[in-house]
Amino acid sequence: MLDSKLLRGQLQEVADRLASRGFSLDVARIESLEERRKAVQTRTEQLQAERNARSKSIGQAKAKGEDIAPLMADVERMANELAAGKVELDGIQAELDGIVLTIPNLPDASVPVGASEDDNVEVRRWGTPRAFDFAIKDHVALGEISGGLDFEAAAKLSGARFAVLRGPIARLHRALAQFMINLHTGEHGYEEHYTPYLVQAPALQGTGQLPKFEEDLFKITREGEADFYLIPTAEVSLTNLVAGEIIDAKQLPLKLVAHTPCFRSEAGASGRDTRGMIRQHQFDKVEMVQVVEPSKSMEALEGLTANAERVLQLLELPYRVLALCTGDMGFGAVKTYDLEVWVPSQDKYREISSCSNCGDFQARRMQARWRNPETGKPELVHTLNGSGLAVGRTLVAVLENYQQADGSIRVPEVLKPYMGGVEVIR
């Protein structure tokens, strides 16, 4: 959520910066509401002062034995007007708050300006895509050969965009997640967490999924109780652990990691990636979250991205890093890097991780603060998140990049300790 001071003092500048994201801010509506809010607030303050004066006069008149009925009537009338003013003021503020919750974050000055993914800027590449001397099979065909990927069984259970994994491929999927968690906790300094997969609306509002992106979520309605939502990412549960907290400066940075399933309706993805595991309603992901001092968040973004890259490097999977343009960044991001892994069957790089600095955008929504030792006062923290990595898409990349001519899959060296001696999946 943006700082309300920005919207009051620099509204047109904010609108211009948001326009670079393709977001049209209704400046006239906000100005109109602000004018009404100020007018009602001024009138209410004046009325309160008059009421206080009348109340004082009642005591004086009573002491003199004068008729206080007219004064009492005035005070009662003013009390009713004050109550009506409060209702009006609350309504205006609720409308302003509703608008603010739909406004995306302001992009950092270092973010390339652009309208779509076509304007993203490649920052670097790592590794060279393998030259195959046989016809490349995609992960669906490879899974059929080994019997380890079954989309028909999943469709029977749940419909489209689900998968059943079995045997060595299921184990490889588990191995990938364990490897990622061990790397991030053992070498990158993250603390592992196990968090709920069901959260309530305030948590999703805190990280920015609600109210704007409810159609992307799976919702569980409960009669007489608060609704649940299945998490679209562990970013929601991990980041909200600091909601409403004031963190001691000595505790920062907080570095949290979790391996969870993620659930997404893919409401806007009709017809896209319908084959295989690239785009699923349910998929596993290892998520990294950092909570840092504001002055250190851009440096932390570079480190977070490097942590995600290290997974791909150790798996020896070719990838590239993109700086997302203003028009392609996520709702809450100040700046984002995407990691894209090489998928041989598609002859292109596909997103496997998104690493974002959200600045104080989420912290303001959650009221997550730290105590600045220089001032002694609570201030908003900065939050960051990144996939480290999406497990299903990493499995796709491993299957395709490590395939052999007969359809078997070599197990990457770093995963062999997790595979119980299995070196080739047939």
UniProtKB/Swiss-Prot annotation:
> Does Kinase show up as a keyword for this record?
no
Instruction: Write out the residues that bind L-serine.
Output: 233-235, 287, 387
According to UniProt, this protein's pathway is:
Aminoacyl-tRNA biosynthesis; selenocysteinyl-tRNA(Sec) biosynthesis; L-seryl-tRNA(Sec) from L-serine and tRNA(Sec): step 1/1
Could you provide one GO biological process annotation from this protein's UniProt record? seryl-tRNA aminoacylation
User: Which catalysed reactions does the entry list for this protein?
Assistant: tRNA(Ser) + L-serine + ATP = L-seryl-tRNA(Ser) + AMP + diphosphate + H(+); tRNA(Sec) + L-serine + ATP = L-seryl-tRNA(Sec) + AMP + diphosphate + H(+)
**InterPro entries from the xrefs?**
aa-tRNA-synt_IIb, aa-tRNA-synth_II, aa-tRNA-synth_II/BPL/LPL, Ser-tRNA-ligase_type_1, Ser-tRNA-synth_1_N, SerRS_1_N_sf, SerRS_core, tRNA-bd_arm
Check the record and name the CDD domains matching this protein.
SerRS_core
Q: Which residues cross the membrane?
A: none
- Which Gene3D superfamilies does the protein's record reference? Bira Bifunctional Protein, Domain 2 (3.30.930.10), Serine-tRNA synthetase, tRNA binding domain (1.10.287.40)
UniProt binding sites for ATP? 264-266, 351-354
**Any Pfam family matching the protein:** Seryl_tRNA_N
Q: What is its EC number?
A: 6.1.1.11
**Record localization:** Cytoplasm
Superkingdom as given in the UniProt entry: Bacteria
Q: Which UniProt keywords apply?
A: Aminoacyl-tRNA synthetase, ATP-binding, Cytoplasm, Ligase, Nucleotide-binding, Protein biosynthesis
Spell out the GO cellular component terms annotated for this protein, sorted alphabetically and separated by semicolons.
cytoplasm
Query: What GO molecular function terms would the record report?
Result: ATP binding; serine-tRNA ligase activity
Could you give the domain comment from the record?
Consists of two distinct domains, a catalytic core and a N-terminal extension that is involved in tRNA binding.
Family affiliation: Belongs to the class-II aminoacyl-tRNA synthetase family. Type-1 seryl-tRNA synthetase subfamily.
| Known function | Catalyzes the attachment of serine to tRNA(Ser). Is also able to aminoacylate tRNA(Sec) with serine, to form the misacylated tRNA L-seryl-tRNA(Sec), which will be further converted into selenocysteinyl-tRNA(Sec).
This protein's assembly is summarised as: Homodimer. The tRNA molecule binds across the dimer.
> This protein is called what?
Serine--tRNA ligase
